[in-house]
């Protein structure tokens, strides 16, 4: 048994908290995350796409739940109301939720013991709005970088987006072990965007995560560089998870 400290990470395309029963249940998303009990979680589709574009799981609900804190990226999207006369006043009158959780739907949640050293919100080349989020974290006095991403449906754009993410990592001032995770929209392990990894990273053997009712495709992936050893990995397929989204969450435990 190794004495090295471990880190459990998870990735979850939560589909704006809308389950396969077509009900929006942010509390159900948090319950699924509690079942997994990861130290760091990358969420995709964590913000709404229309109107105020607020968090699909409200900040207040996350705070009340108490297990996680959102990583603050201090960015926000251009919102529909900002294009209208008196938009800010309308937000107040309608009590709209306009506080986003992440960047283009990508968010990171960490447990309270995880330190946050630095953060970045990345713009990705795209046909439709896409982004990624990056956080440099401190876990048991060991630094680790985590990137959350949701790549394009187009293979050509996925490859460009992965290249942009890897270039952003290379430009970082401090070198540290790195984990990429999210919905890659890539059906094949030999897909073009994953070829950009050039052997510098390994894909954790999590398994198929889509569709949650009958998983046949490993669209969601956790990718770690060779400084990290993968101790275990899998798909979380509890009854609650099968209902909460059309994707199942994936997880991996790595040695730091």
Summary of predicted features, one role per range:
Residues 44:
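Residues lining the SAM
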Residues 1-40, 48-49, 53-54, 64-65, ...:
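Active-site regions of metal-assisted phosphoester/phosphodiester hydrolases
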């Amino acid at each position: 048994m190794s004495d090295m400290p471990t880190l459990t990470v998870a990735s979850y395309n939560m589909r704006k908290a809308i389950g396969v029963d077509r009900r929006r249940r942010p509390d159900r998303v948090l319950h699924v995350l509690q079942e997994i009990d990861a130290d760091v979680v990358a969420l995709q589709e964590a913000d709404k796409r229309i109107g105020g574009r607020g968090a699909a799981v409200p900040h207040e609900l996350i705070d009340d739940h108490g297990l996680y804190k959102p990583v603050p990226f201090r960015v926000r999207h251009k919102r529909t109301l900002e294009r209208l006369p008196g938009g800010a006043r309308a937000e107040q009158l309608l009590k709209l939720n306009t506080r986003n959780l992440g960047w283009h739907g990508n968010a990171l949640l960490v447990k309270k013991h995880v330190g946050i050293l630095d953060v970045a919100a990345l713009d990705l080349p795209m046909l439709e709005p896409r982004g990624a989020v990056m956080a440099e974290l401190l876990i048991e006095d060991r630094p680790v970088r985590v990137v959350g991403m949701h790549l394009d449906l187009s293979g050509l754009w996925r490859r460009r987006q992965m290249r942009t993410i890897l270039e952003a990592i290379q430009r970082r001032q401090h070198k540290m072990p790195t984990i990429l995770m999210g919905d890659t929209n890539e059906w094949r392990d030999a897909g073009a965007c994953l070829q950009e990894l050039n052997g510098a990273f390994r894909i954790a053997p999590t398994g198929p995560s889509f569709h949650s009712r009958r998983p046949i495709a490993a669209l969601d992936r956790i990718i770690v560089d060779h400084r990290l050893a993968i101790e275990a990995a899998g798909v979380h397929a509890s009854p609650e998870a099968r209902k909460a989204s059309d994707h199942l969450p994936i997880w991996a435990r790595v040695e730091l």
